[in-house]
A protein has these predicted regions:
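Short consensus segments that form the blades of beta-propeller domains
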Residues: 203-205
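Generic N-terminal amphipathic/basic segments
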Residues: 1-48, 61-66, 71-75, 80-101, ...
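A cross-kingdom feature marking solvent-exposed beta-strand/loop segments within repeated
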Residues: 51-70, 82-121, 193-200, 224-259, ...
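C-terminal functional regions that serve as terminal interaction/effector modules
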Residues: 2-28, 79-80, 211-298
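A short, N-terminal "cap"/entry segment at the start of jelly-roll beta-barrel domains
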Residues: 2-56, 128-201, 297-298
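Double-stranded beta-helix
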Residues: 116-161, 261-298
Length: 298
């Protein structure tokens, strides 16, 4: 990893993985498949990891998305300025403008779209009905290894409520991306890249015990993934060098070494997804932009 990468200061990046068996990465190229759900003014694609489900929506004015008895908090990411979403949840309502991220509490909720644009929705796999819609659900018929059971983080200060934050946050020296968290997710909207990434400045690293979802919103990325070698040759896996256009989701398993390289000549935008939130990122002062609203576990 480049020493200029803020993540180089994290202790976990120097650790040696102790896992002995390994699962494959997952790749969902939404642009190559029909939507999993078609509704009025709304096309939805779903794919999943061990703990999370990601939904990608192409939406037009009048589109409606609802959840009844949603078991836990979920995420609504609005990357486009042309989209506005009215969110109703448990008798409360809030209008969220485009270029925002919102967190919606458990219970009954409804999203109504004005304008045209994209939505990225994130749920835990406690939403079993959404798991069943995922294009790669069969890959998780048996739980993947090296990942502890999901445990939510504490409720927000002041209790459950619809919360929203602008994505318009300038880059800052020493801070990694633009990170928000809730009780169920951590989302990092990485700096947009223009053109292919410099091959001399990649950032290979690994995670010991959690998956990473890397959602390509714009452009294209090649995900380079290498699994550790152990004494057991039967556990070895070939490297992945997977080209994914957008929209797409790569799910990177622990403890594989990985890095993603922007490939397109224009805009390349990647969003990293973790469920539950990452403790190491949360411990870095100033990295989580809404840390005052969502406490860490005691």
């Amino acid at each position: 990893m480049s020493t200029s990468d803020p993540r180089a200061s994290l202790a976990a990046y120097a650790a040696t993985p102790s896992a002995q068996t390994f699962d494959a990465a997952e790749y969902a190229r939404f642009y190559e498949q029909p939507p999993n759900v078609k509704a009025f003014a709304l096309d939805l694609w779903y794919a999943r990891g061990q703990n999370f489900v990601v939904g990608y929506a192409d939406a037009q004015s009048g589109a409606c998305f609802s959840r009844l008895a949603q078991p836990d908090e979920y995420v609504v990411l609005l990357p486009d300025a042309t989209t506005t979403v009215s969110i109703k949840c448990n008798g409360n309502s809030r209008t969220v403008e485009g270029e925002s991220i919102a967190f919606v509490p458990a219970g009954d909720s409804e999203l109504r779209v004005s304008g045209v644009g994209r939505l990225i929705l994130m749920f835990t796999t406690r939403s079993e009905d959404l798991c069943a819609l995922c294009s790669n659900n069969a890959s998780y018929r048996l739980p993947h290894g090296n990942i502890p059971p999901f445990a939510p983080w504490p409720e927000p200060v002041g209790g459950p409520a619809i919360r929203a934050y602008s994505l318009d946050v300038p880059d800052e020296e020493g801070r990694f991306g633009r990170i928000w968290r809730c009780s169920t997710f951590m989302v990092n909207v990485l700096p947009a890249q223009q053109g292919p990434r410099d091959v001399t400045k990649l950032s290979p690293h690994h995670h010991d015990s959690f998956e990473q979802g890397s959602f390509a919103l714009d452009g294209a990325f090649t995900h380079h993934i290498r699994w550790p070698w152990t004494a057991n040759l039967n556990a070895w896996r070939k490297d992945d060098h997977e080209y994914c256009g957008s929209p797409s989701l790569a799910v990177i398993p622990p403890p594989a070494i990985h890095t993603s390289r922007a490939m397109a000549s224009g805009l390349n935008q990647l969003i990293d997804i973790f469920s539950p939130p990452r403790k190491d990122f949360s411990e870095k002062q100033g990295w989580v932009l809404n840390a005052e609203d969502y406490p860490m576990p005691a």
